[in-house]
C-alpha cells in the first residue's frame, strides 16, 4: 500500500485554496485507507476475482442517481459542489456528466480526489480538526 500523496495534493490544488488544509488532507487519507487502502480503484467483489462492484476510485464512489442524489450524482447536483466540479472537469478535460465522471474516477486520481473533497462540502458537519477524529 502506498498513499498517493502527490495525486491528492494535485487534486486538491484544482479547488479553491480555502478547501484545503491539513485536516482535509488527513480526512481524505483516512477515508481512502478505509475504503480502498489506496490499493483498489474499483469495488472488489468478494469471491469473484476481476469482477467490479459499483464503486470507483480510491474513495469508492458509486454513481448514484439523479433521484437518489447520492454518489457522484450527489456531487454533480449539490449547490455547494456543482460549480467547483464543473471547473475541475473543464480543467481535466472530463465531460461534465455524472456517468463519465464516475467512470473516470477509476483512472483519474486528481478527479477522484476533487470529487471526494467536494462530497465533504455537502456534509453539514465540520471536518475534524483533531487527527483522532478523522479516523
Spans of model-derived segments:
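Helix-loop segments that flank and shape redox-cofactor active sites
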Residues: 14-22
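Peptidoglycan-targeting cell-wall enzymes and recognition modules
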Residues: 2-7, 11, 33-125
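Short, solvent-exposed secondary-structure capping/transition elements
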Residues: 125-132
Amino acid at each position: 500500500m502506498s498513499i498517493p500523496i502527490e495525486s491528492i495534493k494535485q487534486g486538491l490544488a484544482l479547488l479553491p485554496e480555502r478547501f484545503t488544509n491539513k485536516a482535509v488532507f488527513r480526512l481524505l487519507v483516512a477515508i481512502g485507507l478505509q475504503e480502498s487502502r489506496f490499493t483498489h480503484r474499483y469495488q472488489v467483489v468478494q469471491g469473484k476475482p476481476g469482477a467490479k462492484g459499483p464503486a470507483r476510485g480510491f474513495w469508492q464512489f458509486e454513481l448514484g442517481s439523479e433521484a437518489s442524489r447520492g454518489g457522484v450524482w450527489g456531487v454533480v447536483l449539490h449547490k455547494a459542489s456543482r460549480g467547483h466540479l464543473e471547473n475541475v472537469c473543464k480543467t481535466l478535460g472530463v465531460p461534465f456528466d455524472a456517468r463519465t465522471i464516475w467512470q473516470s474516477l477509476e483512472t483519474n486520481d486528481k478527479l477522484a480526489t476533487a470529487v471526494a473533497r467536494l462530497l465533504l462540502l455537502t456534509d453539514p458537519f465540520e471536518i475534524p480538526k483533531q487527527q483522532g477524529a478523522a479516523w
